[in-house]
Amino acid sequence: MKSLLPLAILAALAVATLCYESHESMESYEISPFINRRNANTFMSPQQRWRAKAQKRVQERNKPAYEINREACDDYKLCERYAMVYGYNAAYNRYFRQRRGAKY
């Protein structure tokens, strides 16, 4: 009986400390966490946006041949189906490479 009382007090303290809710874990105190459309991209400077666009243009221009072939095949449904079975290289060769002696 003597050990039961301290054990109950210890359990109550453990529950109280574990269930304590600090103010740090509460949601933001801001009135509205969302911003309007005009201010949505103000965190990124115009120079950074320009640099990102330029980098994307360079990346689009310097694509490897296999990626260009794959994109061409993705736009044509029959080629895409053939590619699922035999691979994109075989599908591109079948549908887009000109055969010898063929007149187009």
Curated annotation (Swiss-Prot):
An example molecular function term from Gene Ontology annotations: calcium ion binding
Keywords, ordered alphabetically: Chondrogenesis, Developmental protein, Differentiation, Disulfide bond, Gamma-carboxyglutamic acid, Osteogenesis, Phosphoprotein, Secreted, Signal
Main location: secreted
InterPro entries to which the protein is assigned, alphabetical: GLA-like_dom_SF, GLA_domain, MGP, Osteocalcin/MGP
Keyword match Disulfide bond: yes
Domain called Gla: residue spans: 51-97
Nucleotide-binding among keywords: no
Signal peptide region: 1-19
Cysteine-cysteine disulfides: 73-79
SUPFAM superfamilies cross-referenced by the UniProt entry: GLA-domain
Domain of life of the native organism: Eukaryota
Compartment(s) where it occurs, according to its Swiss-Prot or TrEMBL record: Secreted
Modified residues (4-carboxyglutamate): 21, 60, 67, 71
An example Gene Ontology biological process: cartilage development
Modification note: Requires vitamin K-dependent gamma-carboxylation for its function.
A single Gene Ontology CC term: extracellular region
Residues with PTM Phosphoserine: 22, 25, 28
Record function comment: Associates with the organic matrix of bone and cartilage. Thought to act as an inhibitor of bone formation.
Family classification: Belongs to the osteocalcin/matrix Gla protein family.
Protein name: Matrix Gla protein
Species annotation: Mus musculus (Mouse)
